[in-house]
Structure formats: C-alpha cells, structure tokens
C-alpha cells in the first residue's frame, strides 16, 4: 500500500509538472486559437534599406546571430510543448523566411498576405485583403503559424509584438492574445 501511494504521488507530480510546462496549450484553448502570428526574429534596424529588392536578401534587413538563436529557441519551445502546425506560412521577406527555416519545425511556404506594407513596397489594402480571405477560410480545427511583420500583426490583432513575439488568434471571433514565452520558459 505504501508503494502504491508513492507511485500515485509520483505520477501525480509528473502529470502536474507536464501540464504546468505547457501553458501555451492552455492559452490556445482559452480562445480556441487557430492561428499563431509570430513577428520575425530579431533583425536589427528599422524598415528596409533604400535599395530594397524582394528578390535579393542582401538588400533587406536580415536576422543577426541573436535573431537566428531567437528563431531556433522559439522552434524548440514549440517542439518541447508538442505544438504541431497544420501549415506554416511566411512573408516573402527574407527575415521571415529565415525565421521559419531556423525554427526547424516543418516545411513552410510564402504567402503575399503576410508581406510588410510599412514602407510602401506592397499595397496595404491588397495584403490585408488576401490575409483576411485566408483567415476567413481557415478551419477552426487547424493551427497555422504565420510569420510576418509588426505592422501586419498589429493591423489584424491590434497588438504590436516585439521581434520573435507571438500572438494567439481565433480567426472566427477575432480574439487575440499575446503569449510571452519569457513568462513560461527560463531559457529565453
């Protein structure tokens, strides 16, 4: 009987520890999020250089070493918490594509509806229209990661995340909630 009690206590502790280490799942469930918006990882600077060319990464603001590490850490956080995405989409900007690659959590594809309209390189209304069509047609049972820019996330959610920041979003009722990994994972 003593061993049975010890085993029950042990399993109870393991179960509680596992559950406590996955607050992102609780937060996703709270709002029935089917989208996780992520701002691209750290890419020092502001906007893009004057010679910006979407087809040339050298003409863009790119991830630095800290940004690469940040993207890898976010990817590890998702893996550790067993977050599986039905789709991973990225802006066509190199810093967003590279964020997806460095996260190493699955294949990603680019989507024009996530491109930055900050400096007028693309038309804001075209981007938001494409994104809204995509969001309106998502299944409530899916979970899609969208790696994009501060201006796009703020336009949809009214929240401005930092580099590498995560916003949970329910595309059906338009509920958004910021999730700060640093509040839950001491490795950040």
Q: Residues of each region from the PLM?
A:
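Active-site regions of oxyanion-processing enzymes, predominantly non-cytosolic
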Residues: 140-141, 145
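Sec/Tat signal peptide C-region and signal peptidase I cleavage site
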Residues: 14-20
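Active-site-proximal alpha-helix that buttresses catalytic centers in soluble enzyme cores
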Residues: 21-120, 139, 159-188
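Sec-dependent N-terminal signal peptides
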Residues: 4-14
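...with weaker cross-activation on analogous glycine-rich loops/strands in unrelated enzymes
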Residues: 134-137
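Short, surface-exposed amphipathic charged segments that create phosphate/polyanion-binding patches used
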Residues: 122-129
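Short, well-ordered beta-to-alpha junction loops that form the rim of enzyme active sites
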Residues: 90-93, 147-151
């Amino acid at each position: 009987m003593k061993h049975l009690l010890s085993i029950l206590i042990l399993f109870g502790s393991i179960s509680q520890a596992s559950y406590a280490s996955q607050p992102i799942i609780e937060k996703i469930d709270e709002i029935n999020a089917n989208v996780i918006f992520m701002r691209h990882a750290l890419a020092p600077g502001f906007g893009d250089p004057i010679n910006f060319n979407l087809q040339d990464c050298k003409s863009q603001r790119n991830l630095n070493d800290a940004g690469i590490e940040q993207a890898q850490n976010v990817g590890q956080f998702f893996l550790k918490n067993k977050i599986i995405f039905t789709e991973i989409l990225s802006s066509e900007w190199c810093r967003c594509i590279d964020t997806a690659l460095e996260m190493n959590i699955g294949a990603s594809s680019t989507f024009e509806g996530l491109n930055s309209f900050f400096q007028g390189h693309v038309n804001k209304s075209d981007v938001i229209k494409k994104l809204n069509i995509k969001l309106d047609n998502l299944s409530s049972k899916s979970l899609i990661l969208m790696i994009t820019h501060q201006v796009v996330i703020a336009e949809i959610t009214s929240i401005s995340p930092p580099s590498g920041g995560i916003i949970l979003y329910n595309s059906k009722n338009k509920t958004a909630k910021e999730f700060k990994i640093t509040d839950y994972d001491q490795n950040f």
